Amino acid sequence: MRHRHGLRKLNRTSSHRLAMLRNMSNSLIEHEVIKTTLPKAKELRKVVEPLITLGKKPSLANRRLAFNRLRDRDSVTKLFEVLGPRYATRPGGYLRVLKFGFRVGDNAPMALVELLDRPEVEEVEVQEAE
């Protein structure tokens, strides 16, 4: 029986899986939107949402817990100074996983993972040099 085994192995060793999810978490916190495969995106959601919940309560203990999981000072700083206050009133569901077609090489289902309530990026018009 496969009851209560809520982890996708993603065809990796445990150390590789931990490192991959840590790198993807740091990338998502830094860029606020990333493109990856659908199973990885669903696992990433289980990692990042509790981290953002930690970021809503800025205590030293929570900072240390977040640093223990992320191992990146810049990501932890952004988590507590930008993302925590942004989602202070939201009771969960900080990420959106959108299906994004299939990869060209192996037809793997792709997904776009983004943080909700991102500030809109204004497009900068490039003036041509005359």
Curated annotation (Swiss-Prot):
Pfam family, one: Ribosomal_L17
GO molecular function, one term: structural constituent of ribosome
A single Gene Ontology CC term: cytosolic large ribosomal subunit
Domain of life (superkingdom): Bacteria
Keywords, in A-Z order: Ribonucleoprotein, Ribosomal protein
PROSITE patterns registered for this protein in UniProt: RIBOSOMAL_L17
One record GO biological process: translation
Subunit field text: Part of the 50S ribosomal subunit. Contacts protein L32.
Family: Belongs to the bacterial ribosomal protein bL17 family.
Protein name: Large ribosomal subunit protein bL17
Organism the protein comes from: Paraburkholderia xenovorans (strain LB400)
Gene name, Swiss-Prot/TrEMBL: rplQ
